[in-house]
Curated annotation (Swiss-Prot):
Record organism: Bacillus subtilis (strain 168)
Gene: yqbK
Positions of transmembrane segments: none
UniProt-recorded name of the protein: Uncharacterized protein YqbK
Coiled coil: none
Family: Belongs to the myoviridae tail sheath protein family.
Classification via InterPro entries: Gp18_domIII_N, Phage_sheath-like_beta, Phage_sheath_subtilisin, Tail_sheath_C
């Protein structure tokens, strides 16, 4: 099913749900339920060019095989401070580390990257059966796999290495003569054979383009582009977001740094922060936190004044006049409060600066954009569910009065929930929802009027369901 922006008098060929947002006065809107951010990273380990859903440290350990404190996962850590779920995408990989662990037997890291150089293979005599050996895989000197075998060909791949070769396995000789393994499962520093030759690879524009192409079929609320000086890639990213929002009806927000996107779907981060451990989160790195925080914003929440967890200062303190100027340019900034030594969001705005009658200054506020996006995405989802359920029962939603009532009931239920939770006000299902058949009589034209709690007037929606 297709989505996008519906232009009155211009019907679209592909079946779908089309929204045309118009604002007639000042308004403010609260956020709906959200929480998923798509994030590309250049990590030193993991499967490449595939989205992996991470909602907890346990997810990370199980699905990626790294600890959350791994240096290459800085952006993930920042995003997870506020996001519910991170769709992690490793952009590229370098060479895979390897080592000969016995004559004619090789262990090779499962993935390319420098993390493979932290893998150690230890071969010890099995204490129960001296005809067998224990082949133990360690990562960062912690045991992650152990196999008891008689021959090399019995070895099976694990989450970290693959084995090739045949024949007997020679017990590892500790360099200092100490025991190769203790009962705790930790590897003495002088034992085992360390893999080597693993390298990282710098992502190219093609890698980021592949990321965007893959993201097109994923569901997320925000998506980050954590790159510094690459105007071409940033322009591609902005075009990607506009296409998703305006042509496909997927109302997401993109977060990048130091780029004048001039669009409500683009957040332009130009400030950075200093973490308590001394790590500098430059603007391009801060896109991960902003995307995570924007995705995880709760119902009726603005990020204005929300603290940046773990930050102790901003990278560049600026005076009031410069803050005002940069805000007018659509820049997302952080501010340092010397009174309580905290760092927080200066103002939750996007990059829109060219205002029109249809997109006034209220569209510069991410809080308002989030609720508009939530209404679009949620109603699209619910209308799809209605259509699918009818088809599952062997029929379609009829282009009749019964069909009109089906759709009206669905929308009424949804907007009533928003009103009950103080997201909108003065909702009148009799006067705020108008449904009619389209010109071809194969779908519905829906007019909606919605007034946010703190808005002076109502937003008007034109929706087509075919």
């Amino acid at each position: 099913m297709n989505g996008g922006t519906f232009t009155p008098g211009k019907e679209k060929e592909r079946a779908g749900i089309y929204f045309n947002f118009k604002t007639t006065a000042e308004n403010r809107v609260s956020a709906g339920e959200r929480g998923t951010v798509a994030l590309p990273i250049a990590s030193s380990w993991g499967e490449v060019k595939k989205f992996i859903s991470i909602s907890s440290i346990e997810d990370l350990n199980k699905k990626v095989g790294l600890n959350i404190d791994d240096p290459s996962l800085l952006l993930l850590r920042e995003a997870m401070k506020k996001a519910n779920t991170v769709l992690l995408y490793r952009l590229t990989e370098g060479l895979r580390a390897s080592a000969d662990i016995s004559e004619g037997v090789k262990a090779t890291a499962l993935y390319g990257g420098t993390k493979g150089n932290d893998i150690i293979i230890s071969i010890t005599e099995n204490v129960i059966d001296s005809s067998k050996v224990d082949v133990t895989t360690y990562l960062d000197q912690s045991e992650v796999d152990k196999q008891t075998v008689s021959k090399a060909e019995e070895l099976k791949p694990n989450k970290y290495v693959t084995f090739t070769g045949k024949g007997d396995l020679t017990v590892t000789i500790p360099l200092t003569g100490t025991a190769p393994e203790d009962v705790s499962g930790a590897l003495p520093a002088t034992s085992g054979i360390r893999l080597s030759g693993g390298t990282d690879k710098t992502p190219t524009n093609a890698d980021y383009t592949a990321f965007l192409e893959a993201a097109e079929t994923e569901y997320f609320d925000t998506i980050a582009l954590p790159v510094e000086d690459n105007e071409q890639l940033k322009a591609t990213f902005v075009a990607f977001i506009k296409r998703l929002r305006d042509n496909q009806g997927q109302k997401v927000q993109g977060v990048l740094s130091n780029y004048k996107g001039d669009h409500e779907g683009i957040i332009n981060v130009t400030g950075g922060v200093l973490l308590e451990d001394g790590t500098e989160i430059t603007p391009e790195k801060a896109t991960a936190w902003v995307a995570g925080a924007s995705a995880g914003a709760t119902f009726n929440q603005s990020l204005t004044f929300v603290e940046y967890e773990g930050a102790v200062d901003v990278l560049n303190r600026i005076d009031n006049d410069e803050i005002v100027e940069r805000l007018s340019n659509g820049e997302f900034l952080f501010t340092y409060d010397s009174r309580d030594k905290s760092v927080s969001v200066e103002k939750d705005i996007n990059s829109l600066t060219s205002l029109t009658a249809e997109k006034n200054k209220m569209f510069q506020k991410n809080k308002i954009v989030r609720v508009l996006d939530a209404i679009n995405n949620d109603l699209t989802s619910q209308l799809k569910a209605l259509i699918k359920s009818r088809k599952a029962s062997g029929s379609d939603v009829p282009a009749t009065n019964d069909g009109l009532q089906f759709v009206k009931t669905l929308i009424t239920q949804y907007l009533s929930v928003l009103q009950d939770n103080e997201g909108i006000t003065d909702f009148d299902s009799e006067n705020d929802i108008t449904i009619a058949l389209n010109n071809d009589r194969d779908g519905f034209l829906i007019d909606l009027a919605v007034q946010p709690v703190d808005a002076a007037e109502k937003f008007y929606f034109n929706v087509e369901v075919k």
